[in-house]
Amino acid sequence: MSASLTAEQKDQKSSVKRPLNSFMLYRRDRQAEIPTSNHQSISRIIGQLWRNESAQVKKYYSDLSALERQKHMLENPEYKYTPKKRSTVRRRHKKVSPSSGSFVASDYVVLQQIAQSSKTLKQTEPEKPVNEEETLAALLAPALSYPKSGKSNLIETSELSCLSSSPMIRSHTIPSLSFTDQVSTTISTLDKSEQAPSSLGIYYRSPSSGSPIGRTKSVCLANKARIVPKRSMSSDGCVDKSYQMSKTPSLEANLPQNSSNCSARRVPKFDSKGTVSEQSNSDSPELSADKVLSHCSPIDARPSTPSCPNASISPKTPNTGDHYGFDGAEYLGTPLSVGSTTAYLYGQETELLSTPYCHTSYPAMSRLNSSSGYTCVSSSSVTNSGHTENNTWRSDEQSKGFVDINSFSQSLFSNGNYEFAAHSQELDDLFSQITDFTSTDPIASSLKDANSLGPSLLEPWLPNSNLF
């Protein structure tokens, strides 16, 4: 009994139809107006009418179909749509008979009749506000055409009209600059850059790293003297003193004003035998500025063998508080000549210092201590005139924080024909002193990393036997 009931329930479930959609509801209402009994003709005619309906009519039937679905859900809560499987046997397509064109023509007649009846109804009804959608549907209704192939010419013409009515894209032709115009534009840009204020800075970036390379005052400088050389010899970080003095005929005009006795500065002059004949600036007016102070001469980057023409002259122990050798005043620390032997003007005395690099600041011995991690502390005081009043060293600072290399430096620079291999043992002793140095001084104790210091980390001009 239960099995039979379940079979009946299954039959009832299978017999439940789907709820009608908006088009089917529209077809149910308009089907009575069509006199034809052919379902294909009815579907074609009603489909054409549905496409020409206004949005209000379509919205009405869509709301009606939503109510129909809710009603169907209440009546059949267990209903679930399962699409039917297609049969494996394919049906053969029936050939269109020549008589099929006759009832298609009848469809046109029916559409024209429906359009005429709608016009007569509108004429009898009172006038209403004009609706654009209804007017468009009324205009399209009599002009409908339905070809045999099933494709509407109306769609094709609408596509063509859309293509023709689309706005044309104007091709704006930009006149390209000729080569002469580009050159003139570049020249005018460079002329403007020369007139730009010097306060404007331009940064350049490296193409590989992306970091800024440097800063220049302007792209093109009309005054070439504003370009500072790479290796500046000035102590205050300004334009190089030697470069300025080489451009002026008078040597005493650009000397520092805070120096007490600038004319008493002595300039060493070497004769053909190699002896030093000192002579003041006032006694040698024929000495040109470019020979006295020359910074633009080529500089050899390789360490050359130092040679001193006079063996009796040796560098003195520095009496400065910093490792660059400046006494606090404006110091004219520029070399007198570029070469292996370089003389520096310092105070009122002429101190000869032999260094392979002309850009090394005076004195070289203090730079050795700065590179090795130790500092030279001096008790000398500096006055406004730039001269040291007290030239004494504190014994405790000298014993704790300073490596005495006077004996080594005298033997190092006294011989004119110096060979690095001959003094390799002395260099090793010096490096061993720096490496094994220990002190309780707070300045030296804060530099514990000096134990890992090797000869390669010292100043580049320091002789090293491993390089040769």
UniProtKB/Swiss-Prot annotation:
Post-translational modification: Phosphorylation results in inactivation.
Region Disordered, annotated ranges: 1-21, 249-290
Residues found modified as Phosphothreonine: T173
Chief localization: nucleus
Pfam families assigned: HMG_box
Keyword Transcription appears in the UniProt entry: yes
Compartments in which it is found: Nucleus; Cytoplasm
InterPro entries registered for this protein in UniProt: HMG_box_dom (IPR009071), HMG_box_dom_sf (IPR036910), SOX_TF (IPR050917)
Feature: DNA-binding region: 16-80
Induction: By nitrogen starvation.
GO cellular component terms attached to this protein's record: cytoplasm; cytosol; nucleoplasm; nucleus; RNA polymerase II transcription regulator complex; Tor2-Mei2-Ste11 complex
UniProt keyword annotation of Nuclease present: no
Reported effect, S218A: 100% activity; nuclear accumulation
Keywords noted in UniProt: Activator, Cytoplasm, DNA-binding, Nucleus, Phosphoprotein, Stress response, Transcription, Transcription regulation
Role summary: Key transcription factor for sexual development. Activates the transcription of the matp, matm, mei2, mfm, ste6 and rgs1 genes. Binds specifically to a DNA fragment carrying a 10-base motif 5'-TTCTTTGTTY-3'.
PANTHER family linked: SOX100B
The name this protein goes by in its record: Transcription factor ste11
Taxonomic source organism: Schizosaccharomyces pombe (strain 972 / ATCC 24843) (Fission yeast)
Gene: ste11
